[in-house]
Amino acid sequence: MQGELTPLKDQVFPIPNCLICYMCKKKMKMKRSKSLSPKASNSEEDMKRTRLEETEVANDIITHPHILDFSDDVLLNIFKYLNPKDLMAISLSCQRLAQIVQDKTLWKRVDFREKPILLSDLKEYIKFLQPITTNLAIRGDLYRENDTELSPCFFNSIKNTCTQLKELIIEEYCINADKIQITDFPGTIEKLSLEGCKMGYLRSNKSYFFKMNFHMPNLTCLILSNCQWFTPHSLLVISKMPKLKELRLNSCHRLGECVAYASLATRFGFKTLEILDLRDTTLGDSEVGCFSCTKTLTHLYLECPSSLRNTDAGDQEPRPLQREILNQPPVYEDVNVAQFLVEDGFRWENYMFERCLITDRAICALGSDTCDRRIINNSAEGVIVVEEDKRIFNNPHLKTLVVRNYPHVTNSSLVHLASNASSLEYLDVSGTSVTRQGVETFKSQRSNVKIVTSFDET
């Protein structure tokens, strides 16, 4: 039967600005013939001619089937399995399919990331969006196109059209921070991803996410992976998000030594944070240890940057870090000073390479720990009475912990986690200095935990 199908180009007839397919033309011809009001005739010859035409049409449908023989409901059910780009291609074939493709049920979850979308083509994609569109994902190409800067018109179109938008994913585009503020994004979204985006014209005295907690009160997931413009002081603003559960900052290479910001953010914010991704950053023990105060944390991902692996501090060439301009103004958050840029003449030559590495100190800060016991009474000669041991449960619900390629993570971390991380279900210590014996001991104590090590790869 497939061999008898008529090619699509032979089934369509071009007319100005649109196409009429073979089946559409046949139906239109039948409608026109019925509207001509033929003369009344009861002759037997006319009846035979009518039956003959009906038989020919039926035989033609059987021998030359067309997709347009299906009803609109059947076609709509078929189209729901196609991706948005295929739907757009089908809409160009004929008028009937174009009308079906525009059905709002097909455009509730829209993901255009299969191929990069150039800015010149973006308008053609936006016109298919509907008020009930809840998910929108687009991807550009920073290396293919010189001008990939999103316009304010794009964000206005989304805000005005997609009034129920819950998820917005924008990858590998340029955003002009002087023209587009965080308040220009739809305030209804619950998930925002700017993975791989470039941000230009950022203000030095204010975080790009300033007052984001008021504009997006329902945001639960924020993905800023590979955003090289993200700076540590923005942690203070993000920590104020009242419903934030997932934060991904992996490959944000400017996220380095920031114990002051991390301490304030975790002490007064991140009250609902569950998933934290800090892989491929230069955060150290002090910063990671601050998140031990986040009681809701269940998933923590840490991995040493590839540029810092297998490197000995003594063998490194001096690499002084670039220093900020001395007279640059401080950064303000909510009228409070959040960041000072200080230049004290200290030469940052190979300043403690280990400072950028996670060690047992950070891992042992996670989970429960025994606090210092208070002396109750020492009045009796030679007798000191102290209070009973108390345990502080910092992360009682930590379920997933990934600590990869840190040479200063040893068996001490395994011993601590075996005793104190009671909710742990998954542990990845690949590339660390744990021993095979230490892993076997951990497995014997916590058989319910799936542990991934470098020994599994050999």
Question: What would you call each of these model-derived segments?
Answer:
Residues 103-106, 129-135, 160-167, 184-193, ...:
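Leucine-rich repeat
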Residues 70-82, 96-98, 110:
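Short hydrophobic alpha-helical "box" of cullin-RING ligase substrate receptors
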Residues 116-121, 142-153, 172-180, 198-207, ...:
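Short, solvent-exposed loop/turn at the beta-strand->alpha-helix junction
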Residues 72, 87-104:
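Short helix-loop-helix/strand-helix junction enriched in hydrophobic and basic residues
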Residues 99, 124-128, 153-160, 180-184, ...:
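Recurring C-terminal helix/loop segment of individual leucine-rich repeat
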Residues 114, 140, 172, 191, ...:
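Structural position within Leucine-Rich Repeats
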Residues 1-69, 341-346, 458:
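CRL adaptor-proximal regions
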Residues 111-166:
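F-box-proximal linker/hinge
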